[in-house]
Design a protein with these regions (language model features):
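Core catalytic alpha/beta fold that binds nucleotide/phospho-ligands
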Residues: 1-193
Length: 193
């Protein structure tokens, strides 16, 4: 299973003041806070760790169908600047991140899905939410169809009762785990192949 998350750094700077009293305490473990405060770029590290938590949470949700908000129960560990792990209730997830011009993008996966997925992060052509969602859906369907040599017209995305997107070939649910994300001017997808 896989999950992803991204942060538009300009929008995050407008929406969240990570330096305000209590922000770090509410979202990050003491080890994570130490990592942030000792970092050469604390702002980047805050959003890197956050995207690791969110992407791993999406995998956990697909596996356990159990929603919760307890960010400190998601413990991040950076192995390299762009690779790490997240531990959630004794389940270990691996992450790979891209720190780009204006964004941080992370994909989380279980060990057996490492390097077995398509992933793409892109800048939107418009700022309208509905158009952004449509553009993201079109991109994931086109990439999946191209990889598997399927006609894209037969593929569709529907959300289940938990709001998790699922991929269909006609009326048949496909077992390929995938995840969509967008924030501000950026969108991304990852899908098992």
């Amino acid at each position: 299973m896989i999950g992803n998350d991204l942060v538009d750094l300009k929008l995050a700077a407008k929406q969240s003041n990570w330096q305000r009293k209590g922000f770090l305490d509410k979202l990050f473990t003491s080890t994570e806070q130490e990592c942030i405060l000792n970092s050469d770029n604390p702002v980047e590290t805050v959003w890197l760790l956050w995207s690791m938590k969110e992407s791993a949470y999406k995998v956990y949700l697909q596996m356990h169908n159990e929603r919760f908000f307890a960010p400190k129960k998601l413990a991040c560990h950076l192995i390299l600047k762009n690779k790490g792990t997240v531990l959630i209730n004794n389940a270990l997830f691996f992450t790979e991140s891209e720190i780009g011009e204006g964004f941080i993008y992370t994909v989380a996966f279980t060990k057996n899905h490492e390097n077995n997925f398509l992933s793409n992060c892109f800048e939107f052509e418009c700022s309208d939410f509905k158009n952004q969602q449509s553009q993201t859906y079109q991109k994931v369907l086109a990439a999946f169809a191209n990889k598997l040599k399927l006609p894209v017209a037969q593929l569709k995305i529907k959300k289940n009762g938990q709001g998790i997107p699922q991929l269909f070939w006609g009326d048949m649910l496909l077992e390929n785990s995938f995840s969509l994300t967008h924030h501000g001017n950026f969108g991304a997808f990852c899908i098992e192949v």
